[in-house]
């Protein structure tokens, strides 16, 4: 078993209401399965690790009440795909979204997130430790000039990484045993790291452009305007006037400062409000769609499912469950 699991995740799981469930082999004979105490929530958390090199995690659980997670993660590099999620990362603030590949660099700043009650967290991820990317890889490939930390940081969060999504699905669906399973997981971890490094090569950094204080203030005004008017169709030329920037500069500066496009920013605001309306009002799906800015409920349902992993009525059923 992985040292990071024994020393960090096991105490964290116990602290937050998980119970060791050694007889549960729904994800295969290898690894350890945990289940949430009925008083706290429901579902399972599966982990498999190899010494101090890496671990693999599969989540499928939900909490009965909104859950605040705050912890200092050990030094590591992780890559995860959420198939269902509802919540927000708080430092820095960003909405958690399903259907994307997300990386995280552990060991630098505390991780803080708010997870919404009753909405299932379904995810699969890989985590590698410094013993893997600073020692093991360099020992195997001493001539290679790679920086895994920069490569993982480059990805951050993207919906355009289909090969990684397929690999994580293969891990989630695998049910092997013994040495065959150990070799399978070891191979998939190496393949994932290879994909991350290749992704960095295919997406080289563009020359850095430092934002001026005036640019930052103008972007914050644009973001505030979008937050107040997210339900409307906002012409781009109005935003360029507000920002005192040309179209190209506005798009690039907004992406640089907020780490998302203007369209993605608006959609995140719409989905956050839609989640609230579905959970706490009796508005129909069509009424929710119109309230947050979509003319058809079918388009809204498609985007909502892409964002949370659930259809609107599925989300409401879970969120309003007592």
Language model regions located:
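Short hydrophobic/aromatic patch on the recognition helix
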Residues: 249-250, 254, 299-300, 304
């Amino acid at each position: 078993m992985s040292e990071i699991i024994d020393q960090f995740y096991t105490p964290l799981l116990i602290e937050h209401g998980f119970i060791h469930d050694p007889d549960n082999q729904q994800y295969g004979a290898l690894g350890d399965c945990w289940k949430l105490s009925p008083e706290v929530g429901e579902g399972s958390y599966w982990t498999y690790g190899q010494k101090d090199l890496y671990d693999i995690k599969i989540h499928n659980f939900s909490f009965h009440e909104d859950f605040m997670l705050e912890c200092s993660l050990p030094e590591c590099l992780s890559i995860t795909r959420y198939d269902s999620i509802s919540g927000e990362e708080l430092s820095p603030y960003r909405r958690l979204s399903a259907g994307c590949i997300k990386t995280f660099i552990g060991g630098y700043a505390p991780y803080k997130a708010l997870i919404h009650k009753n909405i299932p967290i379904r995810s699969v991820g890989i985590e590698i430790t410094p013993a893997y990317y600073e020692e093991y890889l360099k020992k195997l490939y001493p001539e290679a000039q790679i920086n895994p930390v920069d490569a993982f940081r480059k990805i951050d969060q993207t919906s355009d990484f289909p090969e990684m999504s397929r690999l994580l699905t293969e891990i989630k669906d695998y049910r092997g045993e013994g040495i065959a399973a150990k070799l399978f997981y070891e191979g998939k971890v190496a393949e994932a790291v290879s994909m991350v490094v290749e992704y960095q090569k295919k997406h080289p950094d563009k020359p850095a452009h430092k934002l001026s204080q005036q640019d930052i203030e103008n972007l914050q005004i644009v973001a505030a305007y979008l937050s107040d008017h997210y339900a409307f169709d906002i012409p781009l030329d109005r935003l360029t006037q507000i920002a005192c920037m040309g179209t190209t500069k506005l798009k690039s500066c907004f992406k640089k400062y907020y780490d998302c496009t203007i369209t993605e920013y608006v959609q995140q605001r719409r989905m956050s409000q839609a989640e609230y309306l579905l959970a706490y009002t009796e508005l129909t799906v069509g009424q929710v769609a119109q309230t947050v800015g979509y003319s058809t409920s079918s388009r809204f349902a498609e985007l909502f499912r892409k964002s949370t992993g659930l259809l609107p009525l599925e989300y409401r059923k879970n969120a309003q469950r007592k």
